[in-house]
Curated annotation (Swiss-Prot):
UniProt-annotated glycosylation sites, renumbered to this chain: 37, 56, 62, 74, 100, 105, 120, 163, 170, 179, 206, 232, 239, 252, 276, 287, 298, 312, 320, 331
Protein name in the entry: Lysosome-associated membrane glycoprotein 2
Organism ancestry: Eukaryota, Metazoa, Chordata, Craniata, Vertebrata
GO biological process: autophagosome maturation; cellular response to starvation; chaperone-mediated autophagy; lysosomal lumen acidification; lysosomal protein catabolic process; protein targeting; protein targeting to lysosome involved in chaperone-mediated autophagy
Lumenal side: 28-389
PTM notes: Extensively N-glycosylated. Contains a minor proportion of O-linked glycans.
Span list, region Hinge: 193-238
UniProt similarity note: Belongs to the LAMP family.
Membrane-spanning parts: 390-414
Quaternary structure and interacting proteins, as annotated: Monomer. Forms large homooligomers.
Organism field: Gallus gallus
Recorded topology in the membrane: Single-pass type I membrane protein
Second lumenal domain: annotated segments: 239-390
Record Gene3D superfamilies: 2.40.160.110
Amino acid sequence: MAPPRCPAGLALLLLLLGACGFFQSYAVEVDVKDASNFTCLYAQWMMKFLIKYETNSSDYKNASLDLTSTVTHNGSICGSDTQAALLAVQFGDGHSWSINFTKNNETYRAEFITFTYNTNDTAVFPDARRQGPVTIVVKDAMHPIQLNNVFVCHHTTSLEAENVTQIFWNVTMQPFVQNGTISKKESRCYADTPTAAPTVLPTVANVTTASTTISPAPTTAPKPAENPVTGNYSLKTGNKTCLLATVGLQLNISQDKPLLINIDPKTTHADGTCGNTSATLKLNDGNRTLIDFTFIVNASASVQKFYLREVNVTLLNYQNGSVILSADNNNLSKWDASLGNSYMCRKEQTLEINENLQVHTFNLWVQPFLVKENKFSIAEECFADSDLNFLIPVAVGMALGFLIILVFISYIIGRRKSRTGYQSV
């Protein structure tokens, strides 16, 4: 199969951020036949998986799992009025994915997606601590589709659960096919419909979007973009809030030519996991920008503290789901505060993800552990916010003043010695 081509409208952005085809996935086409050799379930789509896994050194790494050129569909079922239809595929070294469909007299809908990845696949999961298959089940949010209509969605959609992000695009799917013929009637996803909001890239300084045309950024540094809007995010375990975060986020991409991207809270969905010693906040801005923040408790310290250990950023092509840029730093030690307290920093801070990507934060207030009554606990402020911050210029000024006085005294003493020498002659 020939490598996928980049959409023309995004060619420039891909050129700025990396080679087009750096991350690739194969299209899947499954045609399930019934006992009479008639098509009963048809699907063609593209998908990929972003997976965070633990290594033997207790660090976390991010893996990108793509479909291979060889995919089987063993176990797929046509379905009936009393039995769900099942679309199942197997690929790579022990990986599998399936989705089941149910119907009534008028409509059909997807119910559950089951994804199994095999951490024994060392090419994808090097040094994985957990060995063997890992299975997650996600409830699909697909709205009911009229029977004998084919579901079509070219735009990118994603599902996040248990450290796995599933990304889909270019989907054409019809279960319960009647008379063995794929329907000509289409039911489009909301993102594909003409009445939907126009597809735009995230807010990017010096990049203008008109339809799908992107103007080039200047060769100099980008003009300062407006500070990002501050968003409020939270995670729950059951009915109890377990993580709170308030922050404005801006990405600074310096690969080849600089770009600034503001994260829009209105289009950003928060997900993640809470735990006693680690917590992860996953932010998804319109299926275009994925940012994961992982917090760790330092239990070895005399006073237990939490801190930001890892940040992972992924930029997706909204048109076809391909990865434009992926960067990770799992060796951070930022935003530390005593366990049970919160961390606050109103001033701008910068997180270095790699040589090409920075994350700027504004109006930050975060508490990833021991949240009580859905409220932030006592805040420990960063040094930039503290009242002692003014002492730095004062101390520098005093040191310079002392140095000037010392030089002046040395000059006076030197002149006196000079005069004494002249008198003795």
